[in-house]
Curated annotation (Swiss-Prot):
This is DNA primase large subunit. Gene3D superfamilies: 1.20.930.80. The lineage of its organism: Eukaryota, Fungi, Dikarya, Ascomycota, Taphrinomycotina. GO terms for biological process: DNA replication initiation; DNA replication, synthesis of primer. [4Fe-4S] cluster binds at residues 291, 369, 386, 428. Binds 1 [4Fe-4S] cluster. PANTHER family: DNA PRIMASE LARGE SUBUNIT.
Length: 459
């Protein structure tokens, strides 16, 4: 499926399904992903394409969990697709040429890569299915009429058309369920369980186990077919995963992808070093996310932070513009119980190391939310990590109260419910919205402490 400089691994890991090796074409932007990709791609493409799609699905899931309206959700999907997974219509072929097929190829491969990653548990499969179905619905609704019809024709659904005679027999009932003029409307019928949302809304007439679906409601039926197809494919993929575990190059990547939605770090630009001084840090704390605020408070209280806390907080301060010289001043003043000699011996080197001035000279970046969530577990005296994950409910409610979110408020309950469901980035996003009412609802969820800080400063 992908290439390396050493060997091919296509044959060994081709079991997305039993499809034969054949050239795949993409006549439209819509895809039921029935045929797996079989040509080689590089490991870099494998990872990059998967991460781009992961970000798209992550924003879709976030928007749905935050109860965005239909219009808000569509706006979020369009924005993130244009940035991460754009696909042009056939009308652009004369302009884009081969790049149009490359866009569709990336979409095809990235779906199957994530299908592998998210087939590993029932919970992951459900999340993947929900997000992919929402993405497909958006694309289907917004596709051009001619391309949409060409796609439907290619699927051979074998829908049973309703004759004019049958339509006349049930005309009044069809009219009542459609709630529109059906004089020029055509209908087809399918088993009622194929369109549960239409049945629930009473948008179709049901007779002898068949739902009479107006052509204008075909979206629901097509999406239902997509979901059913993908659900079966995920179950099939799950059964073949043990064979995939034999490849020690694929496994680490897939494990990483399945841990959660990856933060789109490239969208976050850190301020120039020197933007703030050591003496100004306290005045910026009100703009910190809870993770950084907690570390700052522990540092003030204990005059010290353990290793992982220093690393997490130090890199955050670096991200927001604290230079290495100012960082040395900040930490020296904070560690009031430490002698000058001990500070120089035990802490100075590590601070300079994070700025790329010692050791391997690597210039480290601050941790994103996923890295914080999957970092080292807390030990005695530790303060690093994500408070939404590590705090007890009582401690979380107290922390929210200190930020102006009343314990008995609907907002507090929303945050607590998100935490209980382990949607920590949703909880953080909701806290931002509640503490920045002038900003309103965020289009994208919080996925990086620096993102929170920058949005707060701009508000």
């Amino acid at each position: 499926m992908f290439r390396t400089t050493k060997s091919r691994v296509v044959e060994k890991n081709q079991n997305f399904s039993s499809a034969s090796f054949e050239s795949l074409s993409y006549p439209t932007r819509l895809n039921f992903y029935k045929k797996p990709p079989v040509s080689e791609i590089s490991i870099e493409e494998f990872e990059t394409w998967a991460i781009d799609r992961l970000v798209v699905l992550g924003e879709i899931e976030s928007a749905m969990l935050r109860n965005k309206t239909k219009n808000e959700l569509n706006g979020i999907i369009k924005k993130i697709l244009d940035k991460r997974l754009p696909m042009s219509s056939n009308m652009a072929r004369t302009v884009k040429g081969n790049s149009l097929d490359e866009e569709r190829r990336k979409d095809h491969y990235s779906h199957f890569i994530l299908r592998l990653a998210f087939s590993r548990s029932d919970e992951l499969r459900i999340r993947f299915l929900r997000a992919e179905s929402t993405l497909f619905r958006f694309r289907f609704v917004n596709e051009e009429t001619r391309e949409r019809q060409a796609f439907i024709d290619s699927l051979d659904f074998q829908w049973e058309s309703v004759s004019q005679e049958e339509k006349d027999v049930f005309y009044e009932k069809l009219q009542a369920s459609s709630q529109r003029n059906i004089e020029n409307e055509s209908f087809f019928k399918v088993p009622f369980f194929k369109v549960p949302d239409l049945v629930e809304r009473r948008a179709v007439f049901v007779h002898k186990g068949y739902a009479y679906v107006p052509f204008s409601e075909q979206v629901s039926l097509v999406v239902e077919e997509f979901e059913e197809n993908l659900k079966k494919a995920l179950e099939s993929t799950a059964k073949s995963l043990p064979r995939l575990d034999e490849d020690d190059r694929l496994l680490p990547i897939l494990n990483h992808l399945s841990k959660g939605f990856v933060a789109p770090e490239s969208s976050i630009v850190a301020p120039k070093s020197g933007a703030i001084t050591a003496g100004q840090v306290d005045s910026f704390v009100s703009h910190f996310p809870l993770c950084a605020k907690h570390l700052h408070e522990v540092l003030k209280r204990d005059k010290h932070l353990r290793h992982f806390g220093r690393l997490q907080y130090g890199l955050f301060l670096k991200d927001i513009g604290l230079s290495v010289d100012e960082a040395l001043v900040f930490w020296r003043k904070s560690f009031t119980n430490v002698t000058e000699d001990k500070f120089n011996k035990e802490y100075r080197y590590n601070i300079r190391h994070t700025y790329g001035l010692e050791g391997n000279r690597k210039n480290y970046k601050g941790y994103n939310c996923q890295q914080i969530l999957t970092g080292p577990q807390l030990g005695p005296g530790d303060a690093h990590g994500c408070p939404y994950r590590t705090y007890s409910v009582n401690n979380l409610v107290s922390a929210l109260a200190s930020m102006g979110i009343a314990p008995d408020s609907a907002g507090c309950r929303e945050v607590v419910e998100a935490v209980k469901a382990r949607h920590y980035h949703i909880a953080c996003t909701r806290v931002f919205e509640l503490t920045h009412p002038n900003v309103g609802s965020l289009e994208e969820s919080i996925h990086h402490p620096l993102q929170y800080f920058q949005l707060s400063l701009e508000s």
